[in-house]
């Protein structure tokens, strides 16, 4: 009995470790971009980009807290009503995310009055808005369902793969391009590919 209990605790610890690393790899995806931009363009351009990315991360982290609340509910009921719960949640989230562009225009209007010197940051924020939508769906729908179905290792593997791809793509961009917009488009492209892969 003790051996069985020890194995069970080890499996629980492994699952927790996979989830922890998967969550940190998401943060790393954003951190890699900040690091490369700071190294390539200096602190002034980095501050403009970082302001936009901080707003995106603020929204993603807020949505992530909602996903943490959803996980126990999904874990309890997924076996009996999994497909219906997924479809219903996906529909509701899609409706809510349609309001995100409206929120962007409100934020731009407020910040343009309050911080006019950060006008270029608001432009970057508009480019990164689809990234916020992709990541919000990831942390609100995909991550909780992968956790509920005990697919933490797949979640970690995909996140780490895209961390490596982002490092490679940013390294190539640093060599062959000095346009910061290409970095932003690279952010969007890889996030979109990850979103498609999970769905």
Model-based region annotation:
Residues 1, 150-153, 161-197:
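Membrane-interface helix-loop junctions in multi-pass transport and translocation proteins
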Residues 1-28, 69, 73-83:
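Interhelical loop/hinge segments that connect adjacent transmembrane helices in multipass membrane
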Residues 8-19, 81-98, 119-128, 146-158:
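Membrane-water interface at loop-to-transmembrane-helix junctions
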Residues 17-18, 33-37, 45-63, 130-131:
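Alpha-helical transmembrane segments of polytopic membrane transporters and translocases
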Residues 23, 50-53, 125-128, 132, ...:
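Residue-level recognition of transmembrane alpha-helices
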Residues 56-90, 142-148:
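Helix-loop junctions and terminal segments of transmembrane helices
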Residues 63, 86-137, 167-176:
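Alpha-helical transmembrane segments of multi-pass membrane transport and lipid-handling proteins
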Residues 130-161, 171, 199:
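Membrane-interface junctions at transmembrane-helix termini in multi-pass inner-membrane proteins
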């Amino acid at each position: 009995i003790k051996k069985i209990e020890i194995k069970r605790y080890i499996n629980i610890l492994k699952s927790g470790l996979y989830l922890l690393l998967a969550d940190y790899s998401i943060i790393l995806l954003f951190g890699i971009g900040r690091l490369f931009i700071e190294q390539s363009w200096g602190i002034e351009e980095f501050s403009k980009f970082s302001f936009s990315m901080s707003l995106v991360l603020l929204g993603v982290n807020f949505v992530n807290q909602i996903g943490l609340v959803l996980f126990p509910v999904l874990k309890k009921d997924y076996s009996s009503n999994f497909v219906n719960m997924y479809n219903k949640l996906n529909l509701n989230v899609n409706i809510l995310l349609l309001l995100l562009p409206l929120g962007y225009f409100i934020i731009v209007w407020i910040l343009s009055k309050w911080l006019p010197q950060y006008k270029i940051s608001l432009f970057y924020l508009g480019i990164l808005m689809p990234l916020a939508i992709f990541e919000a769906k990831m942390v609100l729908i995909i991550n909780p369902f992968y956790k509920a179905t005990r697919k933490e290792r797949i979640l970690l593997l995909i996140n780490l793969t895209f961390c490596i791809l982002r490092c490679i793509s940013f390294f190539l961009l640093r060599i062959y391009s000095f346009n910061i917009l290409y970095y932003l488009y690279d952010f969007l492209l890889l996030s979109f590919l990850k979103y498609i892969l999970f769905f």
